[in-house]
């Protein structure tokens, strides 16, 4: 292999598998310009691979329970069709978005974990605390819309990136809801990744199965970990809505949700704090 070939391989790896920065962070990138289902899937795969894990349970990576300093975060660079770029900071212990950077200004959610993240990422920038936290309950409340009424897809992602790039405060909560599902939730579930791929050309609202999976990630993660020492059986069934819109119970690891769908497990040591995070309110302003 000649030097040019080696260089090209390194460039490709840097795009799809993450590049360590001077701060020790890892950056994964996705641009809508020239994108298709293959490039999006490669991006989601690279995002999953960038998350450190504590081993596999039933062939599913188990996220680490904790990690210190800047290593707790990866950076996710997103560009829209016009080439506008934003960079999101993602907590590797739960795939939770902490905030984002555009040009020289960083925006962080109004919550304890995001304020901690601001001490390690986007250093040397003008830092702004958003007037809300990053959990679904709060974002939907501020947006005055539920997730099942907000379209997803490449056009929706393009609009979301533009909204945050120019920071339209009225539309920002909806933009975050689109970004979270298009990136973090797609990394957690193959089904949600496919939902986005099915919406490349035309934006549509997510189906109830996708919303159900999003809501039950911590419970599914917990029961899969319990099943490891319980002959593959869940201690408590997890109720989800399937792709036919029917409420069903997942009771063991032979379920397709476990074998073909869930791609990351939230560590059981973090489940209580994650659930508190999901329903938390904003921090009081000083």
UniProtKB/Swiss-Prot annotation:
One of its GO terms (molecular function) is toxin activity. It comes from the Eukaryota. InterPro entries: Ribosome-inact_prot_sf (IPR036041), Ribosome_inactivat_1/2 (IPR017989), Ribosome_inactivat_prot (IPR001574), Ribosome_inactivat_prot_CS (IPR017988), Ribosome_inactivat_prot_sub1 (IPR016138), Ribosome_inactivat_prot_sub2 (IPR016139). Glycans are attached at residues 103, 110, 252. The active site is at residue 185. GO terms for biological process: defense response to virus; negative regulation of translation. It is an enzyme of class 3 (hydrolase). Residues 1-21 form the signal peptide. SUPFAM superfamilies: Ribosome inactivating proteins (RIP) (SSF56371). It catalyses: Endohydrolysis of the N-glycosidic bond at one specific adenosine on the 28S rRNA. Keywords: Antiviral defense, Glycoprotein, Hydrolase, Plant defense, Protein synthesis inhibitor, Signal, Toxin. Its EC number is 3.2.2.22. Pfam families: RIP (PF00161). PANTHER family: PTHR33453, RIBOSOME-INACTIVATING PROTEIN. Belongs to the ribosome-inactivating protein family. Type 1 RIP subfamily. This is Putative ribosome-inactivating protein. It comes from Cucumis ficifolius (Cucumis figarei).
């Amino acid at each position: 292999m000649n030097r040019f070939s080696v260089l090209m391989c390194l460039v490709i790896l840097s795009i799809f598998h993450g590049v360590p920065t001077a701060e020790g962070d890892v950056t994964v990138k996705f641009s809508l310009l020239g994108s298709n289902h293959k490039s999006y899937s490669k991006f989601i795969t690279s995002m999953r691979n960038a998350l450190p894990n504590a081993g596999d349970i039933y062939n599913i990576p188990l996220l680490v329970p904790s990690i210190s300093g800047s290593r707790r975060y990866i950076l996710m660079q997103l560009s829209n069709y016009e080439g506008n770029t934003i960079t999101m900071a993602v907590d590797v212990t739960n795939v939770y978005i902490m905030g984002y950077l555009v040009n020289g200004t960083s925006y962080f959610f109004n919550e304890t974990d995001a304020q901690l993240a601001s001490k390690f990422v986007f250093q040397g920038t003008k830092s702004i605390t958003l007037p809300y936290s990053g959990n679904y309950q709060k974002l939907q409340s501020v947006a005055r819309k539920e997730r099942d009424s907000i379209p997803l897809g490449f056009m929706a992602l393009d609009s979301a990136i533009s909204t945050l790039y120019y920071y339209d405060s009225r539309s920002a909560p909806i933009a975050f809801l689109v970004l979270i599902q298009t990136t973090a939730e797609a990394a957690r579930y193959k089904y949600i990744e496919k939902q986005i791929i099915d919406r490349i050309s035309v934006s549509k609202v997510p189906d109830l199965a996708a919303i159900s999976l999003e809501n039950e990630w911590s419970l599914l993660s917990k029961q899969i970990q319990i099943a490891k020492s319980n002959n593959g059986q869940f201690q408590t069934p997890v109720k989800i809505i399937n792709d036919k819109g029917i409420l069903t119970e997942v009771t063991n690891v032979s379920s397709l949700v476990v074998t073909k769908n869930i791609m990351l497990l939230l560590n059981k040591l973090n489940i209580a704090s994650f659930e508190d995070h999901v329903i938390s309110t904003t921090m009081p302003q000083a």
